[in-house]
Regions:
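Histidine/acidic residue-rich metal-binding segments in metalloenzymes
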Residues: 1-89, 100-117
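Generic alpha-helix signal with a bias toward terminal, lower-confidence helices
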Residues: 17, 45-47, 79-81, 87, ...
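Short, acidic/turn-prone active-site loops that include or flank metal/cofactor-
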Residues: 36-37, 94-99, 122-124
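His/Asp/Glu-enriched, well-ordered alpha-helical/loop segment
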Residues: 59-62, 66, 106-178
Length: 178
């Protein structure tokens, strides 16, 4: 059994709420939060706090090796670097992103930066193989290159998902062995 703080998204969290959560997190649980899912997330953060979403969450002490950042569609190169620097995990939710018409993240840039990327659904579906298929098509569509994603997407689903789950469950999961 494991727990995390579910924070929803930057645009729903005041500085006071983030401070309260940090102070309440005496057990050093992880956080999961939607990050830059829509372009409006970045606009909101810049207008209210003068910072892009990832930088705001960094300054508020939310990013780190026990944080799962969902989506990260509208992050720029500096934000990708900050996610890597803090060892924050990113979960790509391709069907949810398409269904909400919010865009597609630059999975290849994040992968090349060395970010721990996993594949999720954000509750849009329960079929991870369908998410795999959609993610594979979407990375090709976004990059304009039909030969992309063949290594990255399987790694996200079959390796990184189980490693991230194992990190929080404190157990090896997702491997069939003798």
């Amino acid at each position: 059994l494991a727990a995390m703080f579910g924070l929803h998204a930057s645009f729903t969290l005041s500085p006071e709420t983030l401070a309260y959560v940090r102070e309440a997190n005496t057990d050093k649980l992880g956080y999961h939060i939607h990050v830059a899912e829509g372009a409006s997330d970045e606009t909101d953060s810049i207008e209210k706090y003068g910072l892009r979403t990832v930088e705001r969450l960094y300054q508020e002490g939310i990013l780190g090796p026990n944080t799962i950042a969902g989506h990260c569609i509208h992050v720029d190169a500096a934000e990708i670097n900050r996610l890597k620097e803090t060892d924050t995990m990113v979960v790509h939710n391709p069907e949810s992103n398409m269904g909400n018409a919010v865009g597609a993240p630059d999975i290849l840039a994040m992968y090349k930066a060395g970010i721990r990327l996993a594949l999720g659904t954000d509750g849009y579906t329960s079929d991870m193989l369908e998410s795999y298929k959609v993610a594979n098509c979407l990375v090709k569509h976004r990059s304009g290159l039909p030969n992309q994603g063949w290594g990255e997407i399987p790694t996200m689903l079959f390796e990184n998902n189980r490693r991230i789950a194992g990190q929080f469950l404190k157990a090896e999961v997702g491997i069939i062995k003798e």
